[in-house]
């Protein structure tokens, strides 16, 4: 009789169930905005699994802490929601006027004011002595944090707790420094570079210059964060000091999107964690889709950041959308373009993932944020990408390189450009085939990204960190890391040996040839 083959899912269930009997205490320090959407999914799953979760947030925020069935602790801050909105709108407005396509222009430009506000939150948190005392007495097992505003890193170091980072990536070189992960500019493209992993000589030169630029300007950009951290911890620290103790890096990407590169054992890839199971559409959106006929629909969203587009650009977009036979569902809260065609429907919100999963969806117009990109990949929808800032240009380049979409410069494009791009991804079958191949690769995995994230958070809670995954490179000096002392020592030995051999040869030559010359010379003098 053949042995019974247990399904893989059975073992995965055992894997995830292993932590149920060891419910722990988790401190969560999140970042506001779209970052919270996916982090919240992990937090809710951990609550469902019986853990005691405490979320610490400022009293003024857009999305944080809403509808959570756990303890939420707030602290007062010096600015209002209007201040936050103003800085964010300025950041958005700037991208439509003077695009910041370099790490220097972005970090020292429109983003600086917004991040100055978020960096100041941590000072307000630690000024609340009752809250700090409460957190100290809870004896948490770990901190689950978003590193974008740095406060979670400071909290973890202050309370000496193991930490789990949840992020798409990290600005500057702090992923490489914090995880001690090699990132050679010869084939690993830097953020904002828009390069692939196959670079020309000129591109490799520029990639190295971007790397140098990061080192030059990131310290200026993060100056306030470092000052706040040093003040709270009562000792001078650097950003590397804050990132180095991290136990696990949960990175919202994978190698379906990213180019292959070295990784470390404490880096876990959970790309597509935001791809939820498709739900049935509401009657309103079902009616829109059904009315589209054989041509289907196009989903258009530039994310939560873009609430309004300059009038001239909005009219160009509306003109292009009116030229295609598909029905366009456009998520937009700005002023309605006067030339909006009948096939274009403006909505303030749309169920993006559910619409992308509908068989009648033909294309996805996106700003190339990682959430939208992965929803496009999961549902196999070719994309027209309009990146504006941050990692969006790099995300778009990666999808374009894989033949799954077309990238447009949203500031320079015309109505003809958008029309042609849409017709290309809809009518050229190769784009649909390529995105379906990426979707198949992405879904072929032994465990869902959400379950994987939950497992590693619980792992750190159970074992009070993951020191066995921490490379010894953290404890080396810069010259030891690059083996400059070893190279210098070996070079000194080689030079010493060469010097000795040279001296021996010179001495031998003098003995062999110098002696004969003197003998001959003395013989001639005697003859005379």
UniProtKB/Swiss-Prot annotation:
Keywords: Endoplasmic reticulum, Glycoprotein, Glycosyltransferase, Lipid metabolism, Membrane, Signal, Transferase, Transmembrane, Transmembrane helix. It catalyses: glucuronate acceptor + UDP-alpha-D-glucuronate = acceptor beta-D-glucuronoside + UDP + H(+); 2-hydroxy-17beta-estradiol + UDP-alpha-D-glucuronate = 2-hydroxy-17beta-estradiol 3-O-(beta-D-glucuronate) + UDP + H(+); 4-hydroxy-17beta-estradiol + UDP-alpha-D-glucuronate = 17beta-estradiol 4-O-(beta-D-glucuronate) + UDP + H(+); 2-hydroxyestrone + UDP-alpha-D-glucuronate = 2-hydroxyestrone 3-O-(beta-D-glucuronate) + UDP + H(+). The keyword Cell membrane does not apply. Residues 1-23 form the signal peptide. Highly expressed in liver and at lower levels in stomach and kidney. Its EC number is 2.4.1.17. It is a single-pass membrane protein. It comes from the Eukaryota. One of its GO terms (cellular component) is endoplasmic reticulum membrane. The keyword Lipid metabolism applies. Glycans are attached at residues 69, 290, 428. Its main location: endoplasmic reticulum. One of its GO terms (biological process) is lipid metabolic process. InterPro entries: UDP-glycosyltransferase (IPR050271), UDP_glucos_trans (IPR002213), UDP_glycos_trans_CS (IPR035595). One of its GO terms (molecular function) is glucuronosyltransferase activity. The chain crosses the membrane at residues 486-506. Homodimer. Homooligomer. Interacts with UGT1A1, UGT1A3, UGT1A4, UGT1A6, UGT1A7, UGT1A8 and UGT1A10 to form heterodimers. Belongs to the UDP-glycosyltransferase family. PANTHER family: EG:EG0003.4 PROTEIN-RELATED, UDP GLUCURONOSYLTRANSFERASE FAMILY 1 MEMBER A1. This is UDP-glucuronosyltransferase 1A9. It comes from Mus musculus. The lineage of its organism: Eukaryota, Metazoa, Chordata, Craniata, Vertebrata.
